[in-house]
């Protein structure tokens, strides 16, 4: 028991597993028709961070009316050695990129290839983070509409537990050869996306805004989405009550392998709470 005259203060809080269920399947939608032109692309890189790692391969296919009509494929000279683990994963080595164009020369060509098209990728946040960072460095405008086939798969293929490209391809009967090579992964993703378009039409949808309106925050989807560490602290009695509610929801309603707090629920019970990004497993990292 803390003495009443003590200056010791108890602060209620928790290190939580936060799920971003507010992010749509389509980013920066202009309410394009499902019959829009698409560029489905994939990157291979030297690592996971666009701040410190480099693009080593760009592969893309252009889709019009459900058919692949054009391709874009190139190695990119990263001007640094390719790490051994990346060489093992992609089979791309230094000798294959030594004579390739550098990103400053090839990225303008790629963005021109994408002009007027919706951009599509599997786990689009990763690939677009590299595209946007390099566009920023090179002062190239970059504000496309982006569709994430991972987010679509969570909604359209609810029976799957994992949504890696090879898993989704197998579920839909799509061939995937030379996995972790950009143009092959892009072609596979394009075939998957064309099938998803038909599934969306079967649900009566005709625009990308309607796709986003489906939402991603069902209990089943939250249970399959990635989690980020977060620190949540209560600043008052109301906050402590809301903290208890969130912890109860995380353990009773959304639990799957770990207790999960969706951002939508956090916003609902936001009063009296402070949130931080926690450790290296937090969203900011």
Regions found by a protein language model. Give the residues of each.
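Short, surface-exposed acidic-centric catalytic microdomains
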Residues: 74-89
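Short acidic, Gly/Ser-rich segments with clustered Asp/Glu that frequently serve as metal-coordination loops
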Residues: 43-51
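Phosphodiester-processing cores and adjacent nucleic acid-binding clamps
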Residues: 1-44, 61-62, 67-68, 79, ...
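Short coil-to-beta strand junction motifs in C2/discoidin
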Residues: 54-56
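Conserved catalytic alpha/beta cores of large enzymes that bind or transform nucleotide phosphates
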Residues: 103
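A structural microfeature
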Residues: 70-72
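Early-domain small/polar-rich strand-loop-helix modules and first-structured segments
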Residues: 47, 58-59
């Amino acid at each position: 028991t803390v003495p009443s005259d003590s200056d010791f203060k108890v602060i209620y809080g928790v290190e939580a597993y936060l799920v971003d269920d507010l992010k749509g399947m389509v980013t920066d939608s202009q309410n394009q028709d499902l019959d829009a032109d698409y560029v489905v692309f994939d990157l291979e890189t030297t690592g996971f961070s666009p701040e410190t790692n480099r693009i080593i391969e760009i592969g893309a296919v252009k889709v019009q009316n459900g058919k692949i009509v054009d391709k874009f494929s190139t190695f990119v000279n990263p001007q640094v050695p390719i790490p051994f683990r990346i060489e093992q994963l992609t089979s791309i080595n230094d000798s294959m990129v030594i004579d390739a164009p550098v990103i400053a020369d090839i990225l303008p060509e790629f963005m021109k290839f994408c002009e007027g098209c919706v951009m599509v990728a599997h786990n689009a946040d990763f690939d677009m983070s590299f595209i946007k960072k390099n566009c920023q460095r090179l002062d190239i405008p970059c504000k496309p509409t982006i569709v994430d086939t991972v987010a679509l798969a969570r909604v359209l293929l609810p029976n799957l537990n994992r949504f890696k490209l090879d898993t989704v391809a197998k579920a839909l009967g799509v061939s995937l050869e030379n996995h972790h090579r950009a143009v092959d992964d892009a072609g596979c993703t394009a075939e998957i996306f064309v099938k998803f378009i038909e599934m969306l039409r079967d649900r009566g949808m005709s625009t990308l805004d309607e796709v986003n309106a489906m939402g991603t925050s069902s209990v089943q989807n939250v249970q399959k989405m990635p989690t980020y560490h977060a620190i949540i602290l209560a600043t008052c009695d109301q906050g402590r009550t809301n903290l208890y509610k969130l912890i109860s929801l995380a353990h009773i309603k959304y639990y799957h392998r770990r207790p999960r707090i969706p951002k939508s629920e956090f916003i609902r019970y936001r009063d009296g709470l402070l949130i931080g990004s926690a450790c290296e497993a937090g969203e900011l990292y």
